Amino acid sequence: MNRNRKRVMSLLLTAAMVASATTPILAEEEKKYEVTETEWGYYLVTQDSGETLIYSPNSGVTLLEDDGYAFKDLNQNGVLDTYEDWRLDTETRATALAEMMVADGRDGIESIAGLMLYSAHTAVSSETVSGTELDSRSGTQDGTTTMDAIMTNKLRHVLVTTVASAEIAAKWNNNLQEIVEGMEYGIPCNNSSDPRHEASTDSSVQYVAGESGDISQWPGTLGLAATYDPELVQEFGNIVAIEYRALGITTALSPQIDLASEPRWSRVSGTFGENTALTIDLSRAIVDGYQSTYDEDGNDLGWGDESINAMIKHWPSGGPEEGGRDAHYGYGKYAVYPGNNFDKQILNFTEGALNLDGATEMTSAVMPYYTISYNQDPSGDNVGNGFSNYMINELLRTEYEFDGVVCTDWMITADASSDSVFEGKCWGVEDLTIAERIYTCLMAGVDQFGGNNTIEPVMEAYDIMVELQGQEFADSRFAESTVRLLTNIFNVGLFENPYLDVDESVATVGNAEFMEAGYEAQLKSVVMLKNSNNVISAYDETAEKLTVYVACYTETTTDATTLVTTTTTTPSVSVEVLSQYYNVTTNPEEADFAIIGMESPSTGSGYSTEDLEAGGNGYVPISLQYREYTADTARETSIASDPGAEFIDSDTGEIVYTDEVENRSYQSKSVTASNEYMLDVLEETREAMGDKPVIVYMRQTKATVWSEVEPLADAIIVGYSISDQAAAEIIAGVTEPSGLLPIQQPANMETVEAQDEDVPMDMECYVDADGNTYDVAFGLNWSGVIDDERVATYGSEA
């Protein structure tokens, strides 16, 4: 399936009731619309050469007529207001509603404040809206339910996490939309989601040709990059958009298009890798896939009922984190630019998602990252990107002409008490109040606040703006954000069609066609790094089944109460899927070859409270190897630092601060991977197998130092968030591998320390026993090193 696919469904119902008694009623023969009651209790309004409408009889909204056409009286005033007229363009409608809201005084400003909120994470476990509290993501909940946020705080943007099923999600959406349709202005909810299409590693979840599933299963973002196929990535975007719409989701909090120039960063797996040319093309392709609707002939219609808003992240790239530490915590707040490479870091945005090939032209929303882009603001202001006038107003909006929604990353306006506690991320403005931070964001060009559920601090920020800038400025600034926020709701047609046909949703999400496309993409994403003596070759159905030994991991736990010890043994790759191709044994002596599944070395976040308590600065290395690593060649002095250093008072045990400049260096400190046992099991497997082949399946989330692993393996495949089923099909030779590395694999940790966080593809790469270099765009097929058009296009471009 691609852009020329047939339209699979018409997701959105539309409905209407009888015409408003305050509006002149046309004779039946003059009407250009027809009203039909649906089985779900809504009214469908179909029109001659006009928009299809829906609304609920329970919302209080009725129909207005003009020139024989029907319109929803969303504010229930009996007048066809400009924003209710679907014949007008989005800009006109959004501007008219924004002006109306401002004209309504403080009540209208409160509604605008509600639009500026983006809810905390919300699980949809039932079709009712009033249930579970919104998750504050800080270990506690603030008591706010979805209903509270909608009714009291006028919130219209809900971040949906887990959903019980497509049926439950569709019913929940309809109930939610019915509630807000009856409220002031009748503004629909624009629901969103973080990525939810990564393949399940649960061996019980398998692809079966011709069968449907919960949702289509694709490789992770780094796996999509490994295909080096923009057309496939655009197809992925198309399918995600259709499935999201069927779940009531109209904004994707994705794609994550940061340039993965720092190999230790924990979020590398969510990126398109570190090849600049490739990431530009894939960023453009996926956003085109999200935002454009196509007709049966493959023509790009622009915004339509198969479109979702893309919120690209994270401006101006979260990739160059110093030492690989992530900015969700204060110890990772700084992005650094030792290679003076800021301009290349933003190319994915400026030449990619902000410069689309499709009819929507530009991404509809941008999320700045938590990081302080250290010393990049000419004014010398070092604050988080969401607070930075330079990053948003001067660069994004003025220089690169982006006039869409800018939404902060989650919880940047909340308080933070320590670098090591998961709380707010108010980096650089810790001394301000929550309201002052919101004001700072608004003045910097932000429109919306991720993870904020209540309007009170936004209204306080409005009052601050009135006091400091004047009433006219404050009203104009709030109206400006309102137009942007409403534009994204109008563009996807929610004012006319916010409801779902539940049966259509169930039939659409995870349908057989989408499942097949996702599974094929998984297969295309697998990278074969090593294949000595053609251990992996084409599958021969007529040959006698080989016998495989599957390495296992053993875990022993002791119950703290009963002191009972339990030992659990888990196969490193699903025995169920491997048994489709091989006889499986637990005895290495009986096996023809062995398989071991491994995961990237996991060495933590780069910060240790134990080190802090022991008198250190808390900073430790992030390693890409399993065995102990000592950072002898790390920087003696960190590039970025806080004006005050944090330490533990030995008398009180409390965190205190000094006035001396902080040094975040971890030089000479050591760290060992928490999953070092995987290397132990590989060594044991190698010894047990003797000269018989050992195949390593690496589930990679970021780069690996292969010197510990490669010499012990006869063949290596790498998967990026794929199913064991897809990995097994490649190993068995049912499908020939075609993936290419999207990130470099370092020769050692010394080259990792020497590389610049902001410069992609600047490491010495690992060379294996067969003489192959594990660089970007390297991969093997059955014939050897892949050298095709993809390699010619992207192989040498950093």
Q: Residue locations for each model-derived region?
A:
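Intrinsically disordered, low-complexity Ser/Thr/Pro-rich tracts
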Residues: 19-29
